[in-house]
Amino acid sequence: MVYFVGAGTGAADLITVRGMRLLERADVIIYAGSLVNPELLAYAGKTCEIHNSAKLTLDEVIEIMKEADKQGKMIVRLHTGDQSVYGAVREQMDELDRLGIAYESCPGVSACFGAAASLNLEYTLPGVSQSLIITRMEGKTAVPEKESIESFAAHQASMAIYLSTGLLEELGRRLMAGGYRGDTPAVL
């Protein structure tokens, strides 16, 4: 069995209790290299086999999972944040489906919620915004035209924008082109 576990925002104590327990029980952990706090690996048992996936291909990750599953081992695939938001787990799950290997997901604390908590903020304020848009700028992965920053900014909702810190000047310009004012509060 493979468990996809969200590692949370980076602080080792922000992993979910379920995620921590899965790490403690794991026979094999495959973690996302520099993206996952290495302190989380301290939850692993003494005999746990640990693999850093930073330099592994998808095929190599799947091969580790396949061999461990054949041996009846419990596998944790440890991803940063919450793997359901920009976690790139679908291709792994598709391969596991093809191989007939069972898997489950254990959510993690997503960066947008960790950031709000660390700043004592909330995204939904009566009379201001009752919606939260989670999106990103174009990068290696294209964004559908109908999901442009400008089109989302037109809603004047709260936004959590991922994977875009290298594009801040362009992001600010596009948010204002979509309707946000220059004095709109923002947190990086």
Language-model region placement:
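Class I S-adenosyl-L-methionine
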Residues: M1-V109, G114
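A contiguous loop/helix-start segment that scaffolds small-molecule binding in enzyme catalytic cores
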Residues: V2, E60, K70-I75, S131, ...
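Class I SAM-dependent methyltransferase SAM-binding "motif I" and its flanking Rossmann-like core
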Residues: A11, D82-H155, G182
